[in-house]
UniProtKB/Swiss-Prot annotation:
Function in brief: H(+)/sulfate cotransporter that may play a role in the regulation of sulfate assimilation.
Cleaved signal peptide residues: none
Extracellular face of the membrane: 103-104, 152-158, 217-239, 287-321, 380-395, 442-458
Name recorded for this polypeptide: Probable sulfate transporter 3.5
CDD domains: STAS_SulP_like_sulfate_transporter
Family in the record: Belongs to the SLC26A/SulP transporter (TC 2.A.53) family.
InterPro entries, sorted: S04_transporter_CS, SLC26A/SulP_dom, SLC26A/SulP_fam, STAS_dom, STAS_dom_sf
Ranges of the Cytoplasmic topological domain: 1-81, 126-130, 180-195, 261-265, 343-358, 417-420, 480-634
GO terms for MF: secondary active sulfate transmembrane transporter activity; symporter activity
Membrane topology classification: Multi-pass membrane protein
GO CC annotations, alphabetized: membrane
Gene source species: Arabidopsis thaliana (Mouse-ear cress)
Main location: membrane
Subcellular location field: Membrane
Length: 634
C-alpha cells in the first residue's frame, strides 16, 4: 500500500509551512551573534536615533550611566542618598577592617578599599541599590590561594601579589562585560552559589573562633577538620576574658538582627550594630589596657588617603600562576554575587540592571583599585540590603559613602587602632550566620533533588576540602546535569484534549485521546550528534510499544531549536526504517533554522513537502482523511 496525504501547500492561505529561500551565511551568522551576545539589543534605541548628536549622547549614557541619571538629579533624591550613604559607611568601616583581617592583609587596606571603588561604581554602575565593598568569601579565598607560608614569611610580597591579582580580576571582569560574555557567569547556578556561600560561611565562622578564644597560634587551612583540630590543640591558649567579650558582642549583634527582622523600619539598628561594637570595643580596650589582659587589638592605623600602588604590582613569572588563579576565580565569584544581588534588589523596585554594564563597572572599579592600594571589591549583600532599606534612590549613595570614608581616613583612622580583634571576629560571625540559607536548601530538596545535590556538593566541598575544590565539584555537577539534558532530550507522546484542537502530553493529561492509526511524538530540544542516537532509539521504542498497528508517525519539531547533519541523517534513517514497515513520517512545524537546514540538505525533497505541516491539527486532519479514503491493495 502506498499512502499519500494532502500536501501542506494546498492548505488555506497562511496555513502551510513556509518553504522560502534559506538565508545566506552572513545573515545567519549575524543573527546568531546578536542572540548570543546582544539578546537584549541595548543599542537598538541608539541606532534608531536620527540625530547624530543625540545618538552620541545616548551612546555615552549607555557606557557611562552617571550621564543618564545625574541631569535628572534633585534635592529630594539627595536627601535619601545622603542618609543611605552615611548608614552604609557605619557598616563599611568595621567590615573593611574585619575582611582585611580575613584576607591576612593590613586593616588599613580594607578602609582604602571602601574609599576609591564607590566613586568608580557611581560613575559606571547601573544599579540604584548596590553598595560596593569587600566581601568575606573572596577575602578568605585570596588568602587560601596564596597560602600560609607566603602570608607568614613574606607579607610585603603577599600584599603586592594581592594588588596584582586585583588588577587581573578587574581586567577579566572588564573584558567579560565589554565582550558581553555574561553567559559564563551563568555556569555558577543559583544552587552552586547557595551551597558555596553556605560552606564559606561555615569555615569563616570556625576561623573566627581564633579571635573569640584569643588564640595566638592557629592554622591557615580552611577545612573544618583542620580548623577544629587547631582549636583543640591550642586550648592552653584560650583566654576567658576574650571569650566573654566575644560572646557579649555576638549576642548584641544577633539581637540587633532580630530587631531588624521583627521591626523592618528599625533596619538602622542592625546597620549600626557593628560600628557600636567597634566603638565600645575601642573605648573599653583603651580604658582597661586590653592588651595587658590578653585582648589583642588591630594595632596602628595611619591617617591619610590611599597611596598609589601601581609601582608595587608584581608580574614575576614565579607567581603568575597563583596571581591568575586568585584573580580569575575570585573575579567570577564576585561577579556572580554582585550581579545576582543587584538584580534581586532591582526587582523589588521594578527596575532593571544590565549585567554586562555591571561587569564593566566592577572591572574598572578593581583596575583603578589595584592602582590605589585597594583589593577586590564587589556588591556585598549586607551592605546592599542596608542601602536599599535606607531608601537609596541612585548610585549617589556610594559617592556619599566614599566622602565619609575619606573623612575617616583623613581624621579618624588612628582611633580604630584600639579595636579588639575579638570584636571583629564577632562582627564577621554575625554576618556569616546570615549567609547560611537553610530555608533555600530545604526548598531545593523539596523541589529538585539534583539541584540539592549540586548545592550540597558545594557546601560540603568547601567545608571539608577547600573553597576552590568545592566550587569545581559543584560546577562539575551542574555541567554534567546540563550535558544530561542535552544528551537525553525530553520526548513525549501527545494526545488530543477532548472537544478541542489542543494536543498535550498523555502522561501529564491522562484524559487526552489517542487516535488509532497514527502516533504523535514531540521533541523538546535540539537534535545533534550528542543525542541523535538516543532520539532514534526513543522514537522507535515508542512505535514498538504501540498496541495497535500504525500508518503515520507525526513528529512535532516546534521545540527543536536547531539540528545538525547527524540529526538530519538520524531523521532520514528513522524514515527509512519506518518506510520498511509501511509507516509514513510527517514533520510538524519545523523552526526557521531547522527548516533552512532541511532545505539545504535536500531533506525536504527526500521526505516530500506533502508530509510537512504547520500544526498538529492540520497533520491529524490530513492523516485522518487518508485513513478513511485509502484502501489497501489486494
Amino acid at each position: 500500500m502506498e499512502n499519500t496525504i494532502t500536501s501542506s501547500t494546498s492548505s488555506p492561505k497562511g496555513r502551510g509551512v513556509n518553504f522560502s529561500t534559506p538565508r545566506g551565511f552572513g545573515s545567519k551568522f549575524k543573527s546568531k551573534c546578536k542572540e548570543t551576545f546582544f539578546p537584549d539589543d541595548p543599542f537598538k534605541p541608539i541606532s534608531q536615533e536620527p540625530n547624530r548628536l543625540l545618538k552620541t549622547k545616548k551612546l555615552l549614557e549607555y557606557f557611562v550611566p552617571i550621564f543618564e541619571w545625574l541631569p535628572k538629579y534633585d534635592m529630594q533624591k539627595l536627601k535619601y542618598d545622603v542618609l543611605a550613604g552615611i548608614t552604609i559607611t557605619s557598616l563599611a568601616v568595621p567590615q573593611g577592617i574585619s575582611y582585611a583581617k580575613l584576607a591576612s592583609i593590613p586593616p588599613i587596606i580594607g578602609l582604602y578599599s571602601s574609599f576609591v571603588p564607590p566613586f568608580v561604581y557611581a560613575v559606571f554602575g547601573s544599579s540604584n541599590n548596590l553598595a560596593v565593598g569587600t566581601v568575606a568569601a573572596c577575602s578568605l579565598l585570596i588568602a587560601e590561594t596564596f597560602g600560609e607560608e607566603m602570608i607568614k614569611n613574606e607579607p610585603e610580597l603577599y600584599l603586592h601579589l594581592i594588588f596584582t591579582a586585583t588588577l587581573i580580576t578587574g581586567l577579566f571582569q572588564f573584558a567579560m562585560g565589554f565582550l558581553r560574555l555574561g553567559i559564563l557567569v551563568d555556569f555558577l547556578s543559583h544552587s552552586t552559589i547557595t551551597g558555596f556561600m553556605g560552606g564559606t560561611a561555615i569555615i569563616i565562622l570556625l576561623q573566627q573562633l581564633k579571635g573569640i578564644f584569643g588564640l595566638v597560634h592557629f592554622t591557615h587551612k580552611t577545612d573544618v577538620v583542620s580548623v577544629l583540630h587547631s582549636i583543640l590543640d591550642n586550648r592552653a591558649e584560650w583566654k576567658w576574658q576574650s571569650t566573654l567579650a566575644g560572646v557579649c558582642f555576638l549576642v548584641f549583634l544577633q539581637s540587633t538582627r532580630y530587631i531588624k527582622q521583627r521591626y523592618p523600619k528599625l533596619f538602622w539598628v542592625s546597620a549600626m550594630g557593628p560600628m557600636v561594637v567597634v566603638v565600645v570595643g575601642c573605648v573599653v580596650a583603651y580604658l582597661v589596657k586590653g592588651t595587658a589582659h590578653g585582648i589583642a587589638t588591630v594595632g596602628p592605623l595611619k591617617k591619610g588617603l590611599n597611596p598609589p600602588s601601581i609601582q608595587l604590582l608584581n608580574f614575576d613569572s614565579k607567581y603568575l600562576g597563583m596571581v591568575f588563579k586568585a584573580g580569575i576565580v575570585t573575579g567570577l565569584i564576585a561577579l556572580a554575587e554582585g550581579i545576582a544581588i543587584g538584580r534581586s534588589f532591582a526587582v523589588m523596585k521594578n527596575e532593571q540592571t544590565d549585567g554586562n554594564k555591571e561587569m564593566i563597572a566592577f572591572g574598572l572599579m578593581n583596575v583603578i583599585g589595584s592602582f590605589t592600594s585597594c583589593y577586590l571589591t564587589t556588591g556585598p549583600f549586607s551592605k546592599t540590603a542596608v542601602n536599599y532599606n535606607a531608601g537609596t534612590k541612585t548610585p549617589m549613595s556610594n559617592v556619599v559613602m566614599g566622602v565619609c570614608m575619606m573623612l575617616v581616613l583623613l581624621f579618624l583612622a588612628p582611633l580604630f587602632s584600639y579595636t579588639p580583634l575579638v570584636g571583629l571576629s564577632a562582627i564577621i560571625m554575625s554576618a556569616m550566620l546570615g549567609l547560611i540559607n537553610y530555608e533555600e536548601m530545604y526548598h531545593l530538596f523539596k523541589v529538585d533533588k539534583f539541584d540539592f545535590l549540586v548545592c550540597m556538593s558545594a557546601f560540603f566541598g568547601v567545608s571539608f576540602l577547600s573553597m576552590d575544590y568545592g566550587l569545581i565539584i559543584s560546577v562539575g555537577f551542574s555541567i554534567v546535569r546540563a550535558l544530561l539534558y542535552v544528551a537525553r532530550p525530553s520526548t513525549c507522546k501527545l494526545g488530543r484534549i477532548p472537544n478541542s484542537v489542543m494536543f498535550r502530553d498523555i502522561e501529564q493529561y491522562p484524559a487526552s485521546e489517542e487516535m488509532l492509526g497514527y502516533i504523535i511524538l514531540q521533541l523538546g530540544s535540539p537534535v545533534f550528534f550528542a543525542n541523535s542516537t538516543y532520539v532514534r532509539e526513543r522514537i522507535l521504542r515508542w512505535i514498538r510499544d504501540e498496541p495497535e498497528a500504525i500508518e503515520f508517525l507525526l513528529l512535532d519539531l516546534s521545540g527543536v531549536s536547531t539540528i545538525d547533519m547527524t540529526g538530519m541523517e538520524t531523521l532520514l534513517e528513522i524514515q527509512r526504517i519506518l518506510g520498511s514497515k509501511n509507516i509514513k513520517m510527517v514533520i510538524i512545524n519545523p523552526r526557521f533554522e531547522v527548516l533552512e537546514k532541511m532545505m539545504l540538505s535536500h531533506f525536504v525533497e527526500k521526505i516530500g513537502k506533502e508530509y510537512m505541516f504547520l500544526s498538529i491539527d492540520d497533520a491529524v486532519q490530513a492523516c485522518r482523511f487518508n485513513l478513511t479514503t485509502t484502501k489497501p491493495e489486494v
